[in-house]
């Protein structure tokens, strides 16, 4: 029997995304975004409030990067979610992390995070209920340490963080339990 839990953000898991952009003076800012997802083969949508520093930076620079946070960098990833760039001027510098310019867009790549998408701004979405940023993914970079022998990102090596909205916890992904577009194929024959 199921129990009513009320209104909850009940999508699980959510990725822990590190969104980085330059401000008007080329200063790096990074934000932890749990509410984001792929919305087409080469597009990503991020649900970020319009007044956030990251929103303003992307509006000015027309580009951003989205990195996948991993277990090894959980504390800094969490800091990027609880510290506001509008209130803490040296937010990125406090971490001791390193940024390099993207080769493909005008945005920083945070070297410590192992997988990063380089994105051009496509549009801002404004509705009565949600604000979003849609970006075109122009390239993905990955540290060789998280790639398998076929050159693909290996989830078990990546140790990507997942956000649990039920208990506000971070978890790690990694165990493969089936093959997508194959596990249910037997039911197609019925």
Predicted features and spans:
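Basic, polyanion-binding surface patches
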Residues: 1-190
